[in-house]
A protein has these predicted regions:
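A glycine-rich, often tryptophan-bearing local segment used as a flexible ligand/cofactor-contacting loop or short
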Residues: 439-491
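Short, acidic/turn-prone active-site loops that include or flank metal/cofactor-
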Residues: 20-26, 427, 439-441, 465-468
Length: 491
């Protein structure tokens, strides 16, 4: 927490959660415990007059050996109760992340409510899903009760406290322009300048200008992948009227070790803001296809929801149309729906509606409009479905797959042709085509022995193995002169 940030949040009407920092690092040592508690209490005294501040949280992602120390956990709960007396008007939570079950009492859900001195171990559910994947996957929505954002938890405050750390590049051209115009390099300016030069070289070598126009257009297009993914998660939570808090992971990208973020380190929006803000509208129709690919001609099942923060209620007419890749639009369905309104901010309007998709291959747009009894347009929405026309005659010639052993492309090929799709090898005879579904960068790269040089000049790799996630309990040390180990799901 920072007073200058909270002052601005007060002006803008933003709500903030605040943490003291480093609280989890304090063990049983009385001196360190005094330091972190003093820091916590001073933070509360300093910031409690800010109306934008609504939650105090002690620890981000409580875990590791200290989380298994029941005596230490009990001490921390007492710290929390004492701090709550300084400002009983706010919610105070023990940790963010790692709640597991709705009806169980858990330390991970410990909370103190406003003007309530009782420590509750249920009623506050926060679980983090920060890891990717890199793109939205169609498996993330298969129906009203089969989707990534679904929950039947209706008894607790429900948070998704860290969602989707999706990697996208910074607006490197804009950063380079700002450094050039201001002459201010700072501590990292040369890093960004060198990265921009590398982008320029890649852009020209690959002749990307006819397709993307500029480096900035390219990086914004890549940023849109992340924005659309985050938006679809937010939409899923809102349209199902589930949950109370959604936190994008994260706001600002760190320069080296984590490239997720809405903005880069120079505060440039990484993608086009409209890609993200479509999903944050206060009122629209959420169009949710259960599959985003269809074999032409075919039918695609679609569910229609309303995101309703404008308190629409009563009878309305929902009309659905499909727009073909060449812009021709045809109405498919018109149906009367009833909207609840009030504190129902998301509602399923029409379920499992099968829409015929036929015509040329390309992107088909499913559109929905909601009108009142007077015919006035109140809300609308859209999504896209990729229509694909193919037959096995198109899969002629000799080919191979550069992918993983369980790649769905291989399964599809075998089902379509009755033949096995061989894995690519460098010693194969000339091929007509190759399907590539993985990066060449994940191929084994030999590390030269001289890279393992120790202080005394000996070329050897020293490997320390630990028993725990926090790298505190040493299991053993071994030496080798080459790296040839394979670890399931990474090291």
């Amino acid at each position: 927490g920072s007073p200058v940030v909270l002052e601005k949040a007060d002006e803008l009407g933003l709500l903030y959660l605040e943490e003291p920092g480093a609280f989890h690092s304090a063990g049983h040592d009385p001196f360190i415990r005094t330091i972190v508690n003093t820091k916590l209490q001073r933070m509360i005294l300093r910031d409690r007059s800010h109306p934008s501040l609504v939650i105090y949280n002690l620890i981000n992602e409580w875990g590791g050996p200290r989380a298994r120390d029941k005596e230490l956990t009990a001490l921390r709960m007492e710290d929390m109760k004492k701090a709550h007396t300084i400002d009983p008007s706010r919610v105070m939570t023990f940790t963010s992340g790692w709640a597991s079950a709705e009806h169980s009492e858990e330390d991970a859900k410990a909370n103190l409510l406003p003007f309530d001195s009782v420590l509750h171990r249920k009623g506050w559910f926060d679980n983090h899903r920060a890891a990717g994947p890199a793109t939205w996957e169609e498996d993330y929505y298969r129906g009203p009760k089969d989707n990534l954002m679904y929950t039947d938890n209706r008894t607790e405050i429900y948070l998704r406290g860290e969602e989707g750390a999706l990697s996208t590049p910074p607006r490197i051209a804009e950063i380079a322009k700002e450094i050039e115009q201001t002459g201010i390099k700072g501590w990292d300016g040369l890093f960004w300048k060198n990265q921009y030069e590398a982008f320029q070289q890649f852009f020209h070598e690959k002749n990307l200008a006819p397709y993307f126009g500029s480096i900035d257009s390219l990086t914004r297009a890549m940023g849109d992948v992340s924005f659309d993914h985050q938006g679809r998660r937010i939409q899923g939570m809102r349209m199902q009227n589930t949950g109370d808090v959604y936190a994008v992971n994260g706001w600002e990208a760190m320069p080296y070790d984590n490239h997720s973020g809405i903005v880069d380190i120079y505060r440039n929006c990484k993608g086009n803001p409209s890609t993200f803000t479509y999903y944050t509208q206060p009122l629209y129709v959420a169009v949710s296809p259960r599959t985003q690919f269809v074999h032409l001609p075919g039918k695609v099942p679609v569910d229609f929801y309303i995101v309703n923060e404008k308190n629409l209620s009563g009878k309305y007419r929902l009309s659905v149309s499909v727009c073909t890749p060449d812009g021709k639009e045809g109405k498919h369905i018109e149906k009367e729906v009833h909207i609840t309104g009030g504190d129902c901010f998301g509602q399923l309007l029409l379920e499992n509606c099968h829409l015929a998709i036929e015509g040329a291959s390309g992107l088909y747009q499913v559109k929905a409009q909601l009108r009142n009894t007077s015919g006035h347009l109140c809300a609308e929405g859209k999504d896209e479905v990729l229509g694909i026309y193919w037959d096995e005659k198109q899969l002629k010639g000799k080919g191979a797959l550069y992918g993983t052993p369980d790649d769905p492309v291989a399964t599809f090929y075998q089902k379509a042709t009755g033949c096995e799709l061989p894995a690519f090898r460098s010693d194969m005879e000339k091929l007509d085509w190759i399907v590539v579904t993985r990066s060449s960068l994940d191929a084994p790269q030999p590390v030269p022995v001289e890279a393992f040089c120790q202080k005394e000049g000996k070329s050897v790799l020293e490997l320390s193995l630990y028993k725990d996630d926090d790298l505190r309990t040493l299991a053993g040390v071994t030496q080798d002169n080459k790296i040839d180990r394979t670890f399931a799901d990474g090291a």
